[in-house]
Amino acid sequence: MAELFYDADADLSIIQGRKVAVIGYGSQGHAHALSLRDSGVDVRVGLHEGSKSKAKAEEQGLRVVTPSEAAAEADVIMILVPDPIQAQVYEESIKDNLKDGDALFFGHGLNIRFGFIKPPAGVDVCMVAPKGPGHLVRRQYEEGRGVPCIAAVEQDATGNGFALALSYAKGIGGTRAGVIKTTFTEETETDLFGEQAVLCGGTAALVKAGFETLTEAGYQPEIAYFECLHELKLIVDLMYEGGLEKMRWSISETAEWGDYVTGPRIITDATKAEMKKVLAEIQDGTFAQAWMDEYHGGLKKYNEYKTQDENHLLETTGKELRKLMSWVNDEEA
């Protein structure tokens, strides 16, 4: 069973006694920086010259400096820029500013797990990753609650890495809800697998295949959209609240029977075998290297896939249908 840690297990004074740099000010960056600041921590935000986020961070009362200045000032450096550019930011702005006893923090383990960033031996390498988007992390903190976090230590140069990670997690409200101890390897591999096989890749492919099956059989795209995409939220919300049990308790017996007898025909042993191949490609670094090559090679295939799906009948149908739904915010669609 997982080890869980709460407020009583974490000493906030540890992180309060350090100087923290949050590199990046996106979804997670703003939540970490503001919540740490409100927890009495000395925080600065590191942003590159010309960053659009600088004005927002300063308006919210944070001091903004360049990433290299932030790294030079701080002894705890949390890297929260996108995965593909973390290694570049590290090499250009952080590496030469690290001192023995410093701590390098991450919100996701990809660059450490696959060796794109190789910290020196004298620094702690830690992870604190809230299991929720930044806006939720910040809102829960302000309301006196928290979002569960996972925490890990890859390199414990000082012998105090996990205590520091717990203290950091407490500073953003994580220990109010609970912190699960993990490893960089476990977090990275399971996170990538979940995204690819279930949450994003698996779900998107399932929705598209179902929609195409109905429309190719002559059913109206609008009806197919409702049945294969729109109503997915209703089911996922029930699963989110109470697992498969609550979902099955809430649906009709007809739907539940269809779940039992048809689900295994869609997700077959062959599907699971392919999932195992996907996991193996994550574990051996094939996916990570391919993604880095794609990103730094100009994102040609990425943009082709993106454009192809943007023009899919599912998407064009959905954009029109969502105009009928006053409760749906489709401003960014």
From Swiss-Prot:
User: Which residues are in the KARI N-terminal Rossmann domain?
Assistant: 2-182
Key words of the record: Amino-acid biosynthesis, Branched-chain amino acid biosynthesis, Magnesium, Metal-binding, NADP, Oxidoreductase
Keyword tRNA processing assigned to the entry: answer is no
Q: Can you tell me which residues bind Mg(2+) 2? A: 191, 227, 231
Catalyzes what?
(2R)-2,3-dihydroxy-3-methylbutanoate + NADP(+) = (2S)-2-acetolactate + NADPH + H(+); (2R,3R)-2,3-dihydroxy-3-methylpentanoate + NADP(+) = (S)-2-ethyl-2-hydroxy-3-oxobutanoate + NADPH + H(+)
Q: Which PANTHER family match?
A: KETOL-ACID REDUCTOISOMERASE, MITOCHONDRIAL
Q: What does this protein do?
A: Involved in the biosynthesis of branched-chain amino acids (BCAA). Catalyzes an alkyl-migration followed by a ketol-acid reduction of (S)-2-acetolactate (S2AL) to yield (R)-2,3-dihydroxy-isovalerate. In the isomerase reaction, S2AL is rearranged via a Mg-dependent methyl migration to produce 3-hydroxy-3-methyl-2-ketobutyrate (HMKB). In the reductase reaction, this 2-ketoacid undergoes a metal-dependent reduction by NADPH to yield (R)-2,3-dihydroxy-isovalerate.
From the Swiss-Prot or TrEMBL record, give the protein name: Ketol-acid reductoisomerase (NADP(+))
